[in-house]
């Protein structure tokens, strides 16, 4: 069988610096996501002093702040955490779509990996499930994704 070179990221956060952009809106959910992300990174070797949490009003503001952090050169990875919960108006669609597109654009323009932990749910119950209940903690999953991506990017 032919040998195929495979590049994989090691889940070792030692020496890396991360910024977490977290919304204040729906903070009872977002605080759980932050806890999951910080716990994951620390369990994988990241020192507390290498974590910075930036609190912002809501999801619509995330792309601008993530872009500024990514371009600062201070961080190896950015983690975006928030919760947009559907209501009775189309506001949910506008906010979640623009935040998602903007975060992707910030990541691509800067070349700095970004972990996407912006929950977009139909109701509060779904958000709770994704913030450490039945469906795991999406904050921890976003941290895992950004850590692995940082380590892959180092090898490219």
From Swiss-Prot:
HAMAP family: Lumazine_synth
Entry's Gene Ontology molecular function annotations: 6,7-dimethyl-8-ribityllumazine synthase activity
Record-linked NCBIfam families: lumazine-synth (TIGR00114), PRK00061.1-4 (NF000812)
A Pfam family: DMRL_synthase
Organism expressing this protein natively: Nitratidesulfovibrio vulgaris (strain ATCC 29579 / DSM 644 / CCUG 34227 / NCIMB 8303 / VKM B-1760 / Hildenborough) (Desulfovibrio vulgaris)
Family designation: Belongs to the DMRL synthase family.
GO cellular component terms attached to this protein's record: cytosol; riboflavin synthase complex
Keywords: Riboflavin biosynthesis, Transferase
Binding, 5-amino-6-(D-ribitylamino)uracil: 25, 59-61, 83-85, 116
Protein name per UniProt: 6,7-dimethyl-8-ribityllumazine synthase
Keyword ATP-binding: no
The encoding gene: ribH
Top-level enzyme category: transferase
């Amino acid at each position: 069988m032919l040998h195929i070179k495979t590049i994989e990221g090691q889940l070792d956060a030692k020496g890396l610096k991360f910024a977490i952009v977290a919304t204040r809106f729906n903070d009872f959910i977002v605080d759980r996501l932050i806890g999951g992300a910080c716990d994951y990174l620390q369990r994988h070797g990241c020192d507390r002093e290498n974590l910075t949490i930036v609190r912002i009003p809501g999801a619509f503001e995330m792309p601008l702040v993530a872009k500024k952090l990514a371009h600062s050169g201070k961080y190896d990875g950015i983690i975006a955490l928030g919760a947009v919960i559907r209501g009775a108006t189309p506001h949910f669609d506008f906010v979640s779509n623009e935040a998602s597109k903007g975060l992707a654009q910030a990541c691509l323009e800067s070349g700095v990996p970004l972990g996407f932990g912006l929950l977009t749910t139909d109701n509060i119950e779904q958000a709770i499930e994704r913030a450490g209940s039945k469906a795991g903690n999406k904050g921890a999953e976003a941290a895992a994704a950004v850590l692995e991506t940082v380590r892959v990017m180092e090898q490219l």
